[in-house]
Amino acid sequence: MHILVVSVNYRTAPVEFREKLTFQAAEIERAMTTLQNQKSVLENVIVSTCNRTEIYAVVDQLHTGRYYIKKFLADWFQLEIEEVAPYLTIFEQDGAIDHLFRVTCGLDSMVVGETQILGQIKDSFLEAQQVKATGTIFNELFKQVITLAKRAHSETTIGESAMSVSYAAVELGKKIFGELTDCHVLILGAGKMGELALQNLYGSGARKVTVMNRTLSKAEVMAEKYMGHAKSLSELQCALLEADILISSTGASEYVITKEMMTKVEKMRSGRPLFMVDIAVPRDIDPAIDELEGSFLYDIDDLQGVVEANRAERLKEAEKIQFMIEEEIVLFKTWLSTLGVVPLISALRDKALAIQSETMVSLERKIPNLSDREKKVISKHTKSIINQLLKDPILVAKEIAAEEGASEKLALFAKIFDLETEEVESRAEEVEHKRVWTPSVPSL
């Protein structure tokens, strides 16, 4: 089995391509179910955010797995593989594990150290579990990754100097306008990104805030928290007349603000400039609007300059987290190396249980007058004896599994206990396709 990551991210693909390969939240579970049925794919988790679409997979063959994941992406978004391939980055084995840790800890984010990605990874993993797209390997790996990411943010100061993309958008506005106290700010979208932007705007002194959303009630709830006003998107054109700063993140599949709409609005703004930041993927604002004289449009890729301001400080903390990641990878690989011994241990326990069961049958035949309580006591104690006898051999088997040349030693182990090869292979197949995480083999 192999671990594989196929990634489209802000480092390798411009926003106009990333928005073509963005999974809508409502289709993620269906996408993972579809991918799970692809040849070679044993487990998968799909993560899709404004800056990346990534497929994490356990595959039985690397070459076949790579091909069918690329094909899945192309088919899902109705593109040719040749169109998609140039923008893909592929990580394998140790590189794939390291990438997942770095992404979840915020080290691979446009804004190094941001915490939003941790929640997004966790949500994607839980969705994958719900549709049974994860199994033994990913259930353990993602558990370790999420735990480490939380520890990294609590044990370092990377979160103190890190910024979200929403914060970067606000910082850009402050560079242009200075104080935001007198600026009329318009927020399009009442989701997480919109609220993060509003939090940062409020913290920077903005008080004239309007929140707009397709569902007015959501806009009202968010606006009330920050003493702003809420309006329906049907009033968008009027709101654009009043705004000085616009930050948009609606998650709509088509442009919310078109060049035609903005051309009409500009004529009524009496030459007042409008600073627009589009942090949505797919984009909310028609990029052609930047051609208009009074509209200054920035998209998510333009925020990189603002992000760089605090980068040096964050990178110092990132080095500490990378060291933590490397330690955690060693622990995961040790666990992974012992996974192959589970079928052997299971076969050994099954053989011991069969002997105990045969002994109980023989005992009941020789002493037919045993009460039910006496049978239970005898059964419990014979199982206890077996568990104590097997404890040390099982620990040794696990240690051997983590060593070089383990296969020959484990073969000798199987021979000593007269374990049938077919039985062990059958157990291995069960483990390989298991869909529920089991951290250890249960005792008898």
Curated annotation (Swiss-Prot):
UniProt keyword Repeat present: no
Gene3D superfamilies: Glutamyl-tRNA reductase, N-terminal domain (3.30.460.30), NAD(P)-binding Rossmann-like Domain (3.40.50.720)
Keyword annotations from UniProtKB, A to Z: NADP, Oxidoreductase, Porphyrin biosynthesis
Enzymatic class: oxidoreductase
Signal peptide: none
Pfam families assigned: GlutR_dimer (PF00745), GlutR_N (PF05201), Shikimate_DH (PF01488)
Active site (record annotation): 50 (nucleophile)
InterPro entries for the chain: 4pyrrol_synth_GluRdtase (IPR000343), 4pyrrol_synth_GluRdtase_dimer (IPR015896), 4pyrrol_synth_GluRdtase_N (IPR015895), GluRdtase_CS (IPR018214), GluRdtase_dimer_dom_sf (IPR036453), GluRdtase_N_sf (IPR036343), NAD(P)-bd_dom_sf (IPR036291), Shikm_DH/Glu-tRNA_Rdtase (IPR006151)
SUPFAM superfamilies from the UniProt entry: Glutamyl tRNA-reductase catalytic, N-terminal domain, Glutamyl tRNA-reductase dimerization domain, NAD(P)-binding Rossmann-fold domains
Residues with site note (Important for activity): 99
Domain text: Possesses an unusual extended V-shaped dimeric structure with each monomer consisting of three distinct domains arranged along a curved 'spinal' alpha-helix. The N-terminal catalytic domain specifically recognizes the glutamate moiety of the substrate. The second domain is the NADPH-binding domain, and the third C-terminal domain is responsible for dimerization.
Other comment: During catalysis, the active site Cys acts as a nucleophile attacking the alpha-carbonyl group of tRNA-bound glutamate with the formation of a thioester intermediate between enzyme and glutamate, and the concomitant release of tRNA(Glu). The thioester intermediate is finally reduced by direct hydride transfer from NADPH, to form the product GSA.
Name of the protein this chain belongs to: Glutamyl-tRNA reductase
Lineage, uppermost ranks: Bacteria, Bacillati, Bacillota, Bacilli, Bacillales
